[in-house]
From Swiss-Prot:
Coiled-coil parts of chain: none
Gene behind this protein: plsX
EC number, UniProt record: 2.3.1.274
One annotated Gene Ontology cellular component of this protein: cytoplasm
Organism of derivation: Geobacillus sp. (strain WCH70)
Record's protein name: Phosphate acyltransferase
């Protein structure tokens, strides 16, 4: 199995990308990785090149670049070359922690969209209090969505939850402003009807306040709403941990309490760290494309490789194509 990685994408590239790639090949004996980027910057961190190939390029798509223009003009960038590797069949999947918009553009223009999919969706797996996690899509690939798009998101999400996460008959929820059947705007109401008519295990509308309680295994929404919800969850988690840290270091007694609570706090932080689930998969393309978080460290890259490997091993793309074809028939 071959996985292509953009070694120059992300806040900590190429060091953490390279370290994560080495950890992955040590852990997975069937994985071969191709790193794309500045070889002079990659090699100092590559202490072992067993099953790792480096393809040199100086060109990089920066975080500040306009996504579509960058993909079209920077043909020799590490990200575009990575996507080309998948398109030409020399790699089975690809991963980047770089510019999200550019990766989505490279996915569409280079890797290509599955026939029958109107719009791809960006789908991270987020943590829940019970530790099960839930798949959330779309979180920003498309700010607007029609009812049929939300149905396609649900079909793709159900395949991933079942095949990769091992959840039989995953519960599908539609993010809404209330749980009643007739809640929401026109798009939500029509999407509700479409989802109810499928063979999916559709549990109805779910509210944002219940997401981290594991109310559903897959939650679908438009990219604008999904991105706002995702950033709210991220920001709240960061703020809560900051407040806890301040409260537990404000006095001698609180520091004693912190020492006692430290193992539990570490466990809690690990539970809420969604890098453990891998990156955000870009569903609807002809091959697995994984967007790792921009601040990914080596461990996050390792989990992104694990995720991509599982998507390839479980032939997710073929199953998604079959689900879409069946829905159209």
């Amino acid at each position: 199995m071959k996985i292509a990685i953009d070694a120059m994408g992300g806040d900590h590239a190429p060091k953490e990308i390279v370290l994560g790639a080495m950890k992955a090949v040590q852990h997975f004996s069937d994985v071969h990785i191709t790193l794309f980027g500045d070889e002079g910057k990659i090699r100092p961190y590559l202490t072992s090149d067993e099953r790792i190939t480096v393809i040199h390029t100086n060109e990089v798509i920066e975080a500040t670049d306009e996504p579509v223009r960058a993909v079209r003009r920077k043909k020799q960038s590490s990200m575009v070359l990575m996507a080309e590797e998948v398109k030409e069949g020399r790699a089975d999947a690809c991963i980047s922690a770089g510019n999200t918009g550019a990766l989505m553009a490279a996915g569409l223009f280079v890797v290509g969209r599955i026939a029958g999919i109107d719009r791809p969706a960006l789908a991270p797996t987020l943590p829940t209090i019970g530790g099960e996690g839930f798949l959330f899509l779309d979180v920003g690939a498309n700010v607007d969505a029609r009812p049929e798009h939300l149905l396609q998101y649900a079909l793709m999400g159900a395949v991933y939850a079942e095949k990769v996460r091992g959840i039989p008959r995953p519960r599908i929820g539609l993010l809404n402003v209330g749980t009643e059947d007739q809640k929401g705007n026109d798009v939500a109401k029509k999407a509700f009807q479409l989802l109810r008519e499928t063979d999916l295990n559709f549990i109805g509308n779910v509210e944002a306040r219940d997401l981290l309680h594991g109310v559903a295994d897959v939650v679908v929404t438009d990219g604008f709403t999904g991105n706002v919800a995702l950033k709210t969850i991220e920001g709240t988690a960061i703020s809560v941990f900051s407040m806890l840290k301040e409260a537990l270091t404000s006095s001698f007694l609180s520091k004693l309490a912190a020492a006692i609570l430290k193992p539990k706090l570490i466990d809690l932080k690990k539970t809420m760290d969604y890098s453990e689930y891998g990156g955000a998969a870009l569903f609807g393309l002809n091959a697995p494309v994984v967007k790792a978080h921009g601040s990914s460290d080596a461990n996050a890259i390792f989990h992104a490789v694990r995720q991509a490997r599982e998507m390839v091993a479980n032939d997710i793309i073929t199953t998604i194509k079959e689900a879409i074809e069946q829905n159209h028939s």
